[in-house]
A protein has these predicted regions:
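Alpha-helical transmembrane segments of multi-pass membrane proteins
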Residues: 90-94, 156, 349-353
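N-terminal signal-anchor/initial transmembrane insertion module
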Residues: 44-113, 117, 128-129
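Short, flexible/disordered secondary-structure transition segments
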Residues: 103-110, 133-140, 161-165, 175, ...
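Structural signal for hydrophobic/aromatic residues that build the beta-strand cores
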Residues: 72, 82, 131, 135-138, ...
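C-terminal membrane-associated helical module and adjoining short loops/tails
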Residues: 2-78, 186-407
Protein backbone atom coordinates (compact mmCIF):
# COMPACT_ATOMS: atom_id res chain seq x y z
CA UNK A 1 0.00 0.00 0.00
CA UNK A 2 1.06 3.62 -0.39
CA UNK A 3 3.29 4.49 2.53
CA UNK A 4 3.92 7.98 1.32
CA UNK A 5 5.66 10.37 3.69
CA UNK A 6 4.61 13.24 1.49
CA UNK A 7 3.56 13.76 -2.04
CA UNK A 8 4.97 17.25 -1.78
CA UNK A 9 8.42 15.83 -2.37
CA UNK A 10 7.45 15.45 -5.99
CA UNK A 11 5.99 18.92 -6.22
CA UNK A 12 6.69 21.23 -9.08
CA UNK A 13 8.32 23.85 -6.94
CA UNK A 14 11.37 21.79 -6.05
CA UNK A 15 13.55 18.96 -7.27
CA UNK A 16 13.50 15.73 -5.33
CA UNK A 17 17.25 15.48 -5.25
CA UNK A 18 19.11 16.64 -2.20
CA UNK A 19 18.89 20.34 -2.82
CA UNK A 20 16.88 23.42 -2.10
CA UNK A 21 15.47 25.40 -4.99
CA UNK A 22 14.68 29.03 -4.45
CA UNK A 23 11.57 30.12 -6.25
CA UNK A 24 12.18 33.58 -7.59
CA UNK A 25 10.13 35.98 -5.45
CA UNK A 26 7.26 37.44 -7.42
CA UNK A 27 6.77 41.20 -7.46
CA UNK A 28 4.04 42.31 -5.11
CA UNK A 29 0.96 43.51 -7.01
CA UNK A 30 0.45 47.25 -7.04
CA UNK A 31 -3.19 46.76 -6.14
CA UNK A 32 -3.66 43.91 -3.72
CA UNK A 33 -6.81 41.87 -4.45
CA UNK A 34 -9.18 41.85 -1.49
CA UNK A 35 -11.72 39.44 -0.05
CA UNK A 36 -9.68 36.30 -0.52
CA UNK A 37 -11.44 33.26 0.89
CA UNK A 38 -8.33 31.29 1.82
CA UNK A 39 -5.25 33.54 1.72
CA UNK A 40 -4.90 36.32 4.28
CA UNK A 41 -3.26 39.68 3.59
CA UNK A 42 -0.16 38.63 5.54
CA UNK A 43 -0.24 35.29 3.78
CA UNK A 44 0.09 37.03 0.40
CA UNK A 45 3.50 38.40 1.39
CA UNK A 46 4.76 34.99 2.46
CA UNK A 47 3.37 33.30 -0.66
CA UNK A 48 5.30 35.72 -2.85
CA UNK A 49 8.55 34.96 -1.01
CA UNK A 50 7.95 31.23 -0.46
CA UNK A 51 10.86 28.81 -0.85
CA UNK A 52 10.50 25.04 -0.68
CA UNK A 53 13.21 22.87 0.85
CA UNK A 54 13.38 19.12 0.40
CA UNK A 55 15.44 16.08 -0.52
CA UNK A 56 14.92 12.50 -1.63
CA UNK A 57 17.50 9.80 -0.87
CA UNK A 58 15.58 7.00 -2.61
CA UNK A 59 17.77 4.87 -4.86
CA UNK A 60 14.74 3.99 -6.97
CA UNK A 61 13.96 7.64 -7.52
CA UNK A 62 17.49 8.77 -8.29
CA UNK A 63 18.39 5.87 -10.58
CA UNK A 64 15.10 5.01 -12.30
CA UNK A 65 12.11 7.31 -11.79
CA UNK A 66 13.93 10.63 -12.10
CA UNK A 67 15.85 9.71 -15.28
CA UNK A 68 12.65 8.38 -16.87
CA UNK A 69 10.78 11.56 -16.01
CA UNK A 70 13.64 13.70 -17.31
CA UNK A 71 13.69 11.81 -20.61
CA UNK A 72 9.94 12.32 -20.89
CA UNK A 73 10.31 16.07 -20.38
CA UNK A 74 13.26 16.36 -22.77
CA UNK A 75 11.95 14.22 -25.63
CA UNK A 76 8.17 13.77 -25.37
CA UNK A 77 6.37 16.57 -23.56
CA UNK A 78 5.84 19.87 -25.34
CA UNK A 79 7.35 22.92 -23.59
CA UNK A 80 3.94 24.53 -24.03
CA UNK A 81 2.31 21.91 -21.82
CA UNK A 82 1.55 23.36 -18.39
CA UNK A 83 2.92 21.41 -15.40
CA UNK A 84 -0.50 21.46 -13.72
CA UNK A 85 -1.99 19.84 -16.83
CA UNK A 86 0.50 17.00 -16.44
CA UNK A 87 -0.54 16.63 -12.81
CA UNK A 88 -4.23 16.46 -13.73
CA UNK A 89 -3.48 13.98 -16.49
CA UNK A 90 -1.62 11.74 -14.07
CA UNK A 91 -4.46 11.83 -11.55
CA UNK A 92 -6.97 11.12 -14.31
CA UNK A 93 -5.20 7.84 -15.05
CA UNK A 94 -5.64 6.48 -11.52
CA UNK A 95 -9.21 7.79 -11.34
CA UNK A 96 -10.06 6.02 -14.60
CA UNK A 97 -8.53 2.76 -13.37
CA UNK A 98 -10.55 3.18 -10.17
CA UNK A 99 -13.80 3.63 -12.11
CA UNK A 100 -13.04 0.53 -14.18
CA UNK A 101 -12.39 -1.45 -11.00
CA UNK A 102 -15.62 -0.08 -9.52
CA UNK A 103 -17.59 -1.43 -12.47
CA UNK A 104 -16.20 -4.94 -12.07
CA UNK A 105 -15.85 -5.04 -8.28
CA UNK A 106 -18.48 -2.74 -6.72
CA UNK A 107 -18.23 -4.36 -3.29
CA UNK A 108 -14.43 -4.69 -3.30
CA UNK A 109 -14.66 -8.47 -3.21
CA UNK A 110 -15.67 -9.54 -6.74
CA UNK A 111 -13.04 -10.95 -9.09
CA UNK A 112 -12.36 -8.64 -12.02
CA UNK A 113 -10.82 -9.56 -15.39
CA UNK A 114 -7.05 -9.84 -15.22
CA UNK A 115 -6.51 -6.85 -17.50
CA UNK A 116 -8.25 -4.60 -14.93
CA UNK A 117 -5.49 -5.29 -12.40
CA UNK A 118 -2.78 -4.80 -15.01
CA UNK A 119 -4.36 -1.51 -16.02
CA UNK A 120 -4.41 -0.35 -12.39
CA UNK A 121 -0.72 -1.18 -12.03
CA UNK A 122 0.34 0.57 -15.21
CA UNK A 123 -1.81 3.60 -14.38
CA UNK A 124 -0.13 3.95 -11.00
CA UNK A 125 3.32 3.54 -12.56
CA UNK A 126 2.57 6.26 -15.12
CA UNK A 127 1.19 8.42 -12.31
CA UNK A 128 4.44 8.08 -10.40
CA UNK A 129 6.55 9.05 -13.41
CA UNK A 130 4.30 11.94 -14.45
CA UNK A 131 4.17 13.18 -10.86
CA UNK A 132 7.92 13.69 -11.09
CA UNK A 133 7.80 14.94 -14.68
CA UNK A 134 5.48 17.82 -13.80
CA UNK A 135 8.10 19.24 -11.47
CA UNK A 136 10.84 18.89 -14.06
CA UNK A 137 8.58 20.51 -16.66
CA UNK A 138 7.96 23.41 -14.29
CA UNK A 139 11.68 23.97 -13.78
CA UNK A 140 12.45 23.60 -17.49
CA UNK A 141 9.85 26.21 -18.45
CA UNK A 142 10.51 28.48 -15.46
CA UNK A 143 7.04 27.91 -14.05
CA UNK A 144 7.84 26.64 -10.55
CA UNK A 145 5.47 28.21 -8.05
CA UNK A 146 3.70 27.69 -4.71
CA UNK A 147 0.53 27.08 -6.72
CA UNK A 148 2.21 24.14 -8.44
CA UNK A 149 3.31 22.73 -5.09
CA UNK A 150 -0.16 22.99 -3.58
CA UNK A 151 -1.80 21.68 -6.74
CA UNK A 152 0.49 18.67 -6.75
CA UNK A 153 -0.05 18.08 -3.05
CA UNK A 154 -3.83 18.12 -3.47
CA UNK A 155 -3.72 15.64 -6.34
CA UNK A 156 -1.45 13.32 -4.37
CA UNK A 157 -3.87 13.42 -1.44
CA UNK A 158 -6.71 12.40 -3.75
CA UNK A 159 -4.53 9.64 -5.17
CA UNK A 160 -4.20 8.20 -1.67
CA UNK A 161 -7.99 7.95 -1.41
CA UNK A 162 -8.66 6.61 -4.90
CA UNK A 163 -5.75 4.15 -4.92
CA UNK A 164 -6.78 2.79 -1.53
CA UNK A 165 -10.19 1.80 -2.89
CA UNK A 166 -8.68 0.26 -6.02
CA UNK A 167 -6.11 -1.64 -3.98
CA UNK A 168 -8.71 -2.91 -1.50
CA UNK A 169 -10.65 -4.36 -4.44
CA UNK A 170 -7.50 -5.93 -5.87
CA UNK A 171 -6.66 -7.88 -2.71
CA UNK A 172 -10.38 -8.57 -2.14
CA UNK A 173 -10.79 -7.00 1.28
CA UNK A 174 -14.50 -6.48 0.72
CA UNK A 175 -16.81 -4.03 2.52
CA UNK A 176 -15.11 -4.58 5.88
CA UNK A 177 -13.04 -2.54 8.29
CA UNK A 178 -9.96 -4.02 6.60
CA UNK A 179 -10.69 -1.82 3.58
CA UNK A 180 -10.95 1.23 5.82
CA UNK A 181 -7.61 0.35 7.40
CA UNK A 182 -5.86 0.07 4.02
CA UNK A 183 -6.94 3.66 3.38
CA UNK A 184 -6.18 5.02 6.86
CA UNK A 185 -2.60 3.68 6.82
CA UNK A 186 -1.26 5.85 3.96
CA UNK A 187 -3.55 8.71 4.95
CA UNK A 188 -1.96 8.78 8.42
CA UNK A 189 1.54 8.84 6.96
CA UNK A 190 0.63 11.54 4.46
CA UNK A 191 -0.95 13.76 7.09
CA UNK A 192 1.90 13.30 9.56
CA UNK A 193 4.50 14.04 6.87
CA UNK A 194 2.69 17.28 6.02
CA UNK A 195 2.47 18.08 9.72
CA UNK A 196 6.21 17.39 10.08
CA UNK A 197 6.97 19.70 7.18
CA UNK A 198 4.79 22.41 8.72
CA UNK A 199 6.96 22.48 11.84
CA UNK A 200 10.39 21.75 10.37
CA UNK A 201 10.09 23.78 7.17
CA UNK A 202 11.64 21.00 5.10
CA UNK A 203 10.96 17.47 3.99
CA UNK A 204 13.72 14.87 3.77
CA UNK A 205 12.59 11.59 2.24
CA UNK A 206 14.71 8.63 3.42
CA UNK A 207 16.30 5.96 1.28
CA UNK A 208 13.08 3.94 1.39
CA UNK A 209 9.87 5.98 1.23
CA UNK A 210 6.25 5.88 0.14
CA UNK A 211 6.27 8.03 -3.02
CA UNK A 212 8.85 5.69 -4.51
CA UNK A 213 9.20 2.25 -2.93
CA UNK A 214 5.64 2.33 -1.55
CA UNK A 215 4.19 2.83 -5.01
CA UNK A 216 6.57 0.20 -6.39
CA UNK A 217 5.07 -2.33 -3.97
CA UNK A 218 1.56 -1.35 -5.01
CA UNK A 219 1.90 -1.63 -8.77
CA UNK A 220 3.99 -4.77 -8.39
CA UNK A 221 1.09 -6.33 -6.50
CA UNK A 222 -1.30 -5.20 -9.22
CA UNK A 223 0.81 -6.88 -11.91
CA UNK A 224 1.30 -10.08 -9.88
CA UNK A 225 -2.45 -10.22 -9.23
CA UNK A 226 -3.07 -9.83 -12.96
CA UNK A 227 -0.88 -12.89 -13.53
CA UNK A 228 -1.94 -15.26 -10.74
CA UNK A 229 -5.44 -13.94 -10.01
CA UNK A 230 -6.86 -12.19 -6.93
CA UNK A 231 -8.02 -15.34 -5.12
CA UNK A 232 -4.51 -15.84 -3.77
CA UNK A 233 -5.22 -12.98 -1.38
CA UNK A 234 -8.11 -14.76 0.31
CA UNK A 235 -6.07 -17.90 1.03
CA UNK A 236 -4.83 -18.60 4.60
CA UNK A 237 -1.38 -17.22 5.25
CA UNK A 238 1.40 -19.77 5.63
CA UNK A 239 2.84 -18.20 8.79
CA UNK A 240 -0.48 -17.12 10.30
CA UNK A 241 -3.09 -19.61 9.08
CA UNK A 242 -5.84 -17.93 11.13
CA UNK A 243 -5.48 -14.89 8.85
CA UNK A 244 -5.80 -14.55 5.11
CA UNK A 245 -2.93 -13.18 3.03
CA UNK A 246 -4.73 -9.89 2.47
CA UNK A 247 -5.28 -9.40 6.20
CA UNK A 248 -1.62 -10.05 6.95
CA UNK A 249 -0.67 -7.48 4.32
CA UNK A 250 -2.96 -4.89 5.91
CA UNK A 251 -1.45 -5.52 9.35
CA UNK A 252 2.07 -5.12 7.96
CA UNK A 253 1.01 -1.90 6.25
CA UNK A 254 -0.58 -0.50 9.41
CA UNK A 255 2.49 -1.39 11.48
CA UNK A 256 4.78 0.31 8.99
CA UNK A 257 2.50 3.37 8.87
CA UNK A 258 2.45 3.73 12.66
CA UNK A 259 6.25 3.54 12.71
CA UNK A 260 6.56 6.27 10.10
CA UNK A 261 4.04 8.44 11.95
CA UNK A 262 6.04 8.12 15.17
CA UNK A 263 9.19 9.04 13.26
CA UNK A 264 7.53 12.17 11.89
CA UNK A 265 6.34 13.10 15.37
CA UNK A 266 9.83 12.76 16.83
CA UNK A 267 11.37 14.84 14.03
CA UNK A 268 8.79 17.62 14.44
CA UNK A 269 9.04 17.72 18.24
CA UNK A 270 12.83 17.85 18.18
CA UNK A 271 12.71 20.63 15.61
CA UNK A 272 10.42 22.64 17.88
CA UNK A 273 12.65 22.05 20.89
CA UNK A 274 15.70 23.25 18.96
CA UNK A 275 13.79 26.47 18.38
CA UNK A 276 13.23 26.76 22.14
CA UNK A 277 9.52 26.01 21.74
CA UNK A 278 7.26 23.46 23.38
CA UNK A 279 7.57 20.40 21.17
CA UNK A 280 4.68 18.56 22.79
CA UNK A 281 2.36 21.47 22.00
CA UNK A 282 2.81 20.70 18.30
CA UNK A 283 0.88 17.47 18.84
CA UNK A 284 -2.30 19.53 19.17
CA UNK A 285 -2.21 19.96 15.39
CA UNK A 286 -2.94 16.28 14.78
CA UNK A 287 -6.04 16.11 17.00
CA UNK A 288 -8.56 16.77 14.17
CA UNK A 289 -7.14 13.93 12.12
CA UNK A 290 -7.12 11.59 15.11
CA UNK A 291 -10.77 12.48 15.74
CA UNK A 292 -11.55 11.78 12.08
CA UNK A 293 -9.89 8.36 12.27
CA UNK A 294 -11.59 7.38 15.52
CA UNK A 295 -15.08 8.46 14.52
CA UNK A 296 -14.88 6.84 11.09
CA UNK A 297 -13.62 3.60 12.66
CA UNK A 298 -16.37 3.67 15.30
CA UNK A 299 -18.97 4.28 12.63
CA UNK A 300 -17.83 1.27 10.60
CA UNK A 301 -17.62 -1.02 13.64
CA UNK A 302 -20.91 -0.02 15.31
CA UNK A 303 -23.08 1.10 12.43
CA UNK A 304 -26.71 0.16 13.26
CA UNK A 305 -27.47 -0.83 9.67
CA UNK A 306 -23.91 -1.88 8.79
CA UNK A 307 -23.77 0.97 6.29
CA UNK A 308 -20.19 0.22 5.23
CA UNK A 309 -21.38 -3.06 3.72
CA UNK A 310 -23.71 -1.18 1.37
CA UNK A 311 -21.54 1.88 0.71
CA UNK A 312 -17.85 0.99 1.28
CA UNK A 313 -16.43 3.36 -1.31
CA UNK A 314 -18.79 6.19 -0.47
CA UNK A 315 -17.69 6.23 3.17
CA UNK A 316 -13.99 6.04 2.24
CA UNK A 317 -14.46 8.83 -0.31
CA UNK A 318 -16.20 10.95 2.32
CA UNK A 319 -13.50 10.50 4.95
CA UNK A 320 -10.85 10.85 2.25
CA UNK A 321 -12.12 14.21 1.06
CA UNK A 322 -12.09 15.55 4.62
CA UNK A 323 -8.53 14.22 5.00
CA UNK A 324 -7.45 15.81 1.70
CA UNK A 325 -8.91 19.16 2.72
CA UNK A 326 -7.07 18.96 6.06
CA UNK A 327 -3.68 18.45 4.45
CA UNK A 328 -4.37 21.23 1.94
CA UNK A 329 -5.13 23.64 4.78
CA UNK A 330 -1.99 22.59 6.63
CA UNK A 331 0.18 23.01 3.53
CA UNK A 332 -1.32 26.44 2.90
CA UNK A 333 -0.67 27.44 6.51
CA UNK A 334 2.93 26.31 6.09
CA UNK A 335 3.44 28.39 2.93
CA UNK A 336 1.74 31.43 4.48
CA UNK A 337 3.66 30.97 7.76
CA UNK A 338 0.42 31.12 9.71
CA UNK A 339 -1.03 29.00 12.53
CA UNK A 340 -2.88 25.90 11.43
CA UNK A 341 -6.52 26.48 12.34
CA UNK A 342 -7.96 23.25 13.74
CA UNK A 343 -11.71 23.86 13.80
CA UNK A 344 -12.68 24.01 10.13
CA UNK A 345 -16.40 24.35 9.43
CA UNK A 346 -16.72 21.31 7.17
CA UNK A 347 -14.95 19.06 9.63
CA UNK A 348 -16.79 20.41 12.66
CA UNK A 349 -20.22 19.82 11.11
CA UNK A 350 -19.42 16.19 10.42
CA UNK A 351 -17.57 15.76 13.70
CA UNK A 352 -20.50 16.96 15.80
CA UNK A 353 -23.13 15.04 13.86
CA UNK A 354 -21.03 11.85 13.89
CA UNK A 355 -20.48 12.14 17.63
CA UNK A 356 -24.20 12.63 18.27
CA UNK A 357 -25.02 9.60 16.15
CA UNK A 358 -22.34 7.31 17.59
CA UNK A 359 -23.19 8.38 21.15
CA UNK A 360 -26.87 7.68 20.54
CA UNK A 361 -27.92 11.22 21.44
CA UNK A 362 -29.88 11.58 18.21
CA UNK A 363 -31.49 8.75 16.20
CA UNK A 364 -29.78 7.48 13.07
CA UNK A 365 -32.83 7.52 10.86
CA UNK A 366 -31.88 6.42 7.35
CA UNK A 367 -28.17 5.84 7.78
CA UNK A 368 -27.41 5.62 4.08
CA UNK A 369 -28.83 9.11 3.63
CA UNK A 370 -26.50 10.39 6.35
CA UNK A 371 -23.46 9.00 4.52
CA UNK A 372 -24.66 10.45 1.23
CA UNK A 373 -25.22 13.84 2.85
CA UNK A 374 -21.74 13.79 4.38
CA UNK A 375 -20.26 12.91 0.99
CA UNK A 376 -22.02 15.84 -0.69
CA UNK A 377 -20.80 18.20 2.05
CA UNK A 378 -17.22 16.90 1.82
CA UNK A 379 -17.12 17.02 -1.98
CA UNK A 380 -18.64 20.50 -2.14
CA UNK A 381 -16.20 21.86 0.44
CA UNK A 382 -13.20 20.30 -1.31
CA UNK A 383 -14.20 21.55 -4.77
CA UNK A 384 -14.83 25.00 -3.28
CA UNK A 385 -11.35 25.08 -1.78
CA UNK A 386 -9.60 23.79 -4.90
CA UNK A 387 -11.32 26.28 -7.19
CA UNK A 388 -11.02 29.42 -5.09
CA UNK A 389 -7.60 28.69 -3.64
CA UNK A 390 -6.17 27.95 -7.10
CA UNK A 391 -7.61 31.15 -8.56
CA UNK A 392 -6.44 33.19 -5.57
CA UNK A 393 -2.88 31.89 -5.82
CA UNK A 394 -2.86 32.40 -9.59
CA UNK A 395 -3.95 36.02 -9.06
CA UNK A 396 -1.38 36.62 -6.33
CA UNK A 397 1.47 35.12 -8.37
CA UNK A 398 0.33 36.60 -11.68
CA UNK A 399 0.20 33.24 -13.46
CA UNK A 400 -2.32 31.02 -15.25
CA UNK A 401 -3.24 27.66 -13.74
CA UNK A 402 -3.10 25.65 -16.97
CA UNK A 403 -0.93 27.84 -19.15
CA UNK A 404 2.85 28.11 -19.31
CA UNK A 405 4.06 31.57 -18.38
CA UNK A 406 6.39 32.79 -21.11
CA UNK A 407 9.63 34.54 -20.26
Amino acid sequence: MVLTRSAAAAAKSTPKEDETETIKPQPEPETKPQNYRYVTEDGVKHILAYRYSGSDASLLYNNVISPLAQWLVDHVLSPRLAPNAITIGALSLVILSHVIMLCYSPNMVEEAPRWVYANAGLSLLFYQILDVADGKQARKTGNSSPLGLLFDHGCDALNVVVSACTFASTIMLGPTYWSLLIFLAPAMVFFMATWEEYYTGTLALPIINGPNEGLLIMYSIYIVTAIVGPNVWTQPNILFPQLNNNHVFVLITITSAVGQCLFSAVVAIRSMERKAKDGAAALVGITPFIALILLSALWVLWSPSDVFTDHPRLLIWTVGLVFAKMVMHMMLSHMCEEPYWLLRKTFMIQLVVSFLLVAGIVPWGHESSVVQLFFVISLSAYVHMIYFLSTELATILGIRIFKVKQG
